[in-house]
Regions:
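A glycine-rich phosphate-binding loop feature that marks nucleotide/adenosyl-phosphate handling sites
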Residues: 1-9, 83-87, 110-118
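Composition- and surface-driven signal marking solvent-exposed, interaction-prone regions
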Residues: 10, 81-82, 147-152
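Conserved, mostly hydrophobic/aromatic
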Residues: 68, 135, 164
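Aromatic- and carboxylate-lined catalytic core of secreted/periplasmic carbohydrate-active enzymes
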Residues: 71-72, 77-113
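Carbohydrate-binding surface patches
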Residues: 114-158
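Solvent-exposed beta-hairpin/edge-strand motifs
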Residues: 154-169
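C-terminal beta-strand-rich structural cap/linker in extracellular carbohydrate-active enzymes
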Residues: 173-200
Length: 200
């Protein structure tokens, strides 16, 4: 929680509890701000129960996991209270995190949208050799008949071909970064989207 994060502590501990506030939406601002000074690998980020015990807010299970995956991911809930479907979803979420863990621990971070300043949060992690990347975004509040949200990735190799998942399309890095990707957020508040990029 508060005041546990200071630069000197990293001499003794590689990972710190980022905040006692584990609300999926609140964590976008908490993690965004913390990342200005500390590596994502040092930020302990947990998926917790809903309604959240600090804010009373309900956020989708998938969204809580997507935001937690932008740090050292864990779970803070009682597995005995989970349904069979939720347990299966956790297994899928853990597999997703394992696939991107190398980017969390050693990739380059690009902050695309600041949730404190706009109704949008987006961060992108890119491998040092630009061979792969992941982009995660959250739209906190749903907007009726709102404009399309276009995300502009950064840090890709302009001349390389990338497969974009889950769309299963192949585009040049330059095209992806300049034309952008339309973000199809799930209906409702606090929806997230995640895109993976792999050199084709």
């Amino acid at each position: 929680g508060g005041c546990r994060f200071d630069a000197a502590i990293l001499r003794w501990f590689p990972q710190i509890w980022t905040s006692d506030n584990s609300d999926g939406y609140a964590r976008t601002a908490i993690q965004y701000g913390t990342s200005l000074c500390y590596p994502l690998s040092a930020m302990s980020c947990h998926v917790s129960v809903c309604p959240n015990h600090q804010t009373g807010r309900n956020t989708p299970f998938a969204s809580r996991a997507a935001i937690a995956h932008l740090g050292a991911t864990g779970y803070e809930l009682n597995p005995n209270n989970l349904t069979a479907a939720e347990k299966a979803e956790i297994k899928s979420q853990v597999d997703e995190y394992k696939a991107m863990e190398g980017l969390v621990l050693g990739g380059d971070l690009y902050r695309l949208h600041n949730p404190v300043e706009e109704n949008l949060f987006a961060e992108m992690l890119v491998a040092k050799d630009k061979s792969e990347a992941v982009l995660t975004a959250m739209r906190p509040l749903s907007v009726a008949n709102g404009e399309s949200v276009i995300l502009y990735p950064e840090g890709l190799d302009e001349n390389a071909d990338y497969e974009v998942l889950p769309q299963k399309i192949v585009r040049k890095g330059a095209t992806i970064m300049r034309a952008g990707l339309v973000a199809y957020f799930p209906f409702g508040d606090f929806g997230t989207v995640t895109y993976r990029f792999r050199k084709a």
